[in-house]
């Protein structure tokens, strides 16, 4: 009997020429039905704050917003699929940069010498009109990435409200900043731990990277600026040190979700090779780096995932970085680039 009533209601709706949009507003019942919009409530008052705190930290997982969200695939899980087509495979890009420039400097050695500083370099970043690595990556995201990011943002604002969204994103970036400060204290031989730093060392993120830190030695640079004068971009790298005996540009990342494969880190490899290429040709540095390391740390303290990049892999990502840089330059010429929301 209830099924017949339900079928009758459906026929009435079709005969009334209800649109798809109108049908979405109908609340069905087995005994009666009504049509109307739900009463608007304050989404910030009813939000599950624990749930969305974890969600925001998962999406805004990195210091730079090139990775916010850090994954088109993660966005698809949050927002639903956009289309039935498969996401393009980055490995299928066969384009060649028009203006090729080598990532490695043939005039430099990757072996330490007497002129190398005993104290890690920490060159301040000079704010100027030269674009940063983060800005280039932000401004050259695919249209699908931009769309998914904006859709995610609007959904979060709907749930949290404008003030709630700002508060959560601020907390995420503050947490990332403190994580990097704690690592700097650990890796700097001349640093003395303050009470605040000691508290930071007890965080899950620091616990997560303990097994990685055991293999890190010979720190050459920490939170240090690099500039590529020929290709005209700047950046602020996290660390240059030896990992398992090989000198690397190290990038520390945080994530709520496991990222056991380098493909899961999305634009992070491009960030690493961009810093590497700039540093290898920056006169402030006397040495050369040919390897990269992305370390993804987890808040719950579970072991971080290290993603090592040898010289061959770095060269492959360098080609992709040059393409993104050319795309940025072309957009700038066409005056289509807007001021970035975040910078390094």
Swiss-Prot record:
<dbReference type="GO" id="GO:0008297">
    <property type="term" value="F:single-stranded DNA exodeoxyribonuclease activity"/>
</dbReference>
<feature type="active site">
    <location>
        <position position="238"/>
    </location>
</feature>
<keyword id="KW-0597">Phosphoprotein</keyword>
<comment type="function">
    <text>Metal-dependent single-stranded DNA (ssDNA) exonuclease involved in mitochondrial genome maintenance. Has preference for 5'-3' exonuclease activity but is also capable of endonuclease activity on linear substrates. Necessary for maintenance of proper 7S DNA levels. Probably involved in mitochondrial DNA (mtDNA) repair, possibly via the processing of displaced DNA containing Okazaki fragments during RNA-primed DNA synthesis on the lagging strand or via processing of DNA flaps during long-patch base excision repair. Specifically binds 5-hydroxymethylcytosine (5hmC)-containing DNA in stem cells.</text>
</comment>
<dbReference type="InterPro" id="IPR038726">
    <property type="entry name" value="PDDEXK_AddAB-type"/>
</dbReference>
<keyword id="KW-0227">DNA damage</keyword>
<dbReference type="GO" id="GO:0005759">
    <property type="term" value="C:mitochondrial matrix"/>
</dbReference>
<dbReference type="GO" id="GO:0006264">
    <property type="term" value="P:mitochondrial DNA replication"/>
</dbReference>
<keyword id="KW-0935">Progressive external ophthalmoplegia</keyword>
<keyword id="KW-0378">Hydrolase</keyword>
<keyword id="KW-0234">DNA repair</keyword>
<dbReference type="InterPro" id="IPR011335">
    <property type="entry name" value="Restrct_endonuc-II-like"/>
</dbReference>
<dbReference type="GO" id="GO:0017108">
    <property type="term" value="F:5'-flap endonuclease activity"/>
</dbReference>
<feature type="modified residue" description="Phosphoserine">
    <location>
        <position position="343"/>
    </location>
</feature>
<feature type="active site">
    <location>
        <position position="251"/>
    </location>
</feature>
<feature type="active site">
    <location>
        <position position="253"/>
    </location>
</feature>
<dbReference type="InterPro" id="IPR011604">
    <property type="entry name" value="PDDEXK-like_dom_sf"/>
</dbReference>
<keyword id="KW-0496">Mitochondrion</keyword>
<dbReference type="GO" id="GO:0000002">
    <property type="term" value="P:mitochondrial genome maintenance"/>
</dbReference>
<keyword id="KW-0540">Nuclease</keyword>
<dbReference type="GO" id="GO:0005739">
    <property type="term" value="C:mitochondrion"/>
</dbReference>
<comment type="similarity">
    <text>Belongs to the MGME1 family.</text>
</comment>
<keyword id="KW-0225">Disease variant</keyword>
<keyword id="KW-0269">Exonuclease</keyword>
<dbReference type="Pfam" id="PF12705">
    <property type="entry name" value="PDDEXK_1"/>
</dbReference>
<keyword id="KW-1274">Primary mitochondrial disease</keyword>
<protein>
    <recommendedName>
        <fullName>Mitochondrial genome maintenance exonuclease 1</fullName>
        <ecNumber>3.1.-.-</ecNumber>
    </recommendedName>
</protein>
<dbReference type="GO" id="GO:0043504">
    <property type="term" value="P:mitochondrial DNA repair"/>
</dbReference>
<dbReference type="GO" id="GO:0045145">
    <property type="term" value="F:single-stranded DNA 5'-3' DNA exonuclease activity"/>
</dbReference>
């Amino acid at each position: 009997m209830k099924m017949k009533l339900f079928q009758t209601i459906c026929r009435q709706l079709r005969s009334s020429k209800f649109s798809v949009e109108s049908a979405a507003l109908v609340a069905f019942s087995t005994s009666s039905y009504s049509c109307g919009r739900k009463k608007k409530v304050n989404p910030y008052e009813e939000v599950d704050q624990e749930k969305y705190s974890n969600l925001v930290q998962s999406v805004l997982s990195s210091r730079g917003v090139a990775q916010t969200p850090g994954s088109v695939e993660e966005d698809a899980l949050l927002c639903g699929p956009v289309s039935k087509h498969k996401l393009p495979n980055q490995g299928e890009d066969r384009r060649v940069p028009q203006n090729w420039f080598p990532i490695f400097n043939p005039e430099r050695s990757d072996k330490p010498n007497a002129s190398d500083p005993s104290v890690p370099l920490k060159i301040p970043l000079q704010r100027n009109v030269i674009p940063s690595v983060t800005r280039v990556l932000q401004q050259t995201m695919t249209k699908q990435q931009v769309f998914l990011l904006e859709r995610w943002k609007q959904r979060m604002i709907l749930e949290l409200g404008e003030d709630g969204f700002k508060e959560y994103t601020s907390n995420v970036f503050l947490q990332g900043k403190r994580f990097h400060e704690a690592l700097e204290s650990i890796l700097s031989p001349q640093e003395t731990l303050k009470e605040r730093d000691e508290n930071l060392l007890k965080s899950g993120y620091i616990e997560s990277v303990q097994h990685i830190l055991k293999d890190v030695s010979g720190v050459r640079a920490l939170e240090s600026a690099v500039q590529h004068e020929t290709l005209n971009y700047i950046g602020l790298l996290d660390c240059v040190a030896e990992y398992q005996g090989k000198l690397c540009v190290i990038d520390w990342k945080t994530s709520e979700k496991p990222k056991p494969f380098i493909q899961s880190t999305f634009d992070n490899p491009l960030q690493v090779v961009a810093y590497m290429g700039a540093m290898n040709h920056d006169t402030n540095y006397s040495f050369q780096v040919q390897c990269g390391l992305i370390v993804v740390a987890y808040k719950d303290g579970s072991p971080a995932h290290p993603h090592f990049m040898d010289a061959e892999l770095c060269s492959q990502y360098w080609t992709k970085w040059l393409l993104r840089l050319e795309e940025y330059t072309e957009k700038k010429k066409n005056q289509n680039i807007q001021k970035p929301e975040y910078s390094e």
